[in-house]
Amino acid sequence: MNLKQNLEYHYKAFDRTKLEPDPLQFLHMFKDEVDIEVVGLIASIFAYGNVKQIENTLKKLITLFNGKPFSFIKNFAAKDSQKFAAIKHQFYSEDDVKKLFVILNKEINRHKSIKQIFLQGYNISDPNVKNGISNFSKHFINSFNETFGNVSDGIKFMFPLP
């Protein structure tokens, strides 16, 4: 059984009634693969700290997405940054959150999806996905560096190296 088949098996066998208050609960609000990818990435970025705070932050973001996370990010403009004024999470600053969405917009428009960004740095012959995850994080850190000239500690925490 390859990795994809193994993950699919566990995904189908998982009892979703026990999901809440896990951040993964937010992925199940969407059906479109690109929306699920976006919400999955966002949930993973904000999934640390107090469970209630994680849930509150993700609810605020999901509300901003207005039911279309991928479309929200694809069409995001710097002028939309004020929508994140009230969103802070642990040690992510408001500026970190704004820059995150600027970069997500840039990279999704360049590569078409989160999946494509991941696949660009993933080698199917690798024994596990560690290098793929590492390359994914490096891709975003490099994009932040190219766009903003420096990378805050908050941004580095969003895209850690395994």
Segments predicted by a language model, with ranges:
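HhH-family (HhH-GPD) DNA N-glycosylase catalytic core used in base-excision repair
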Residues: M1-P162
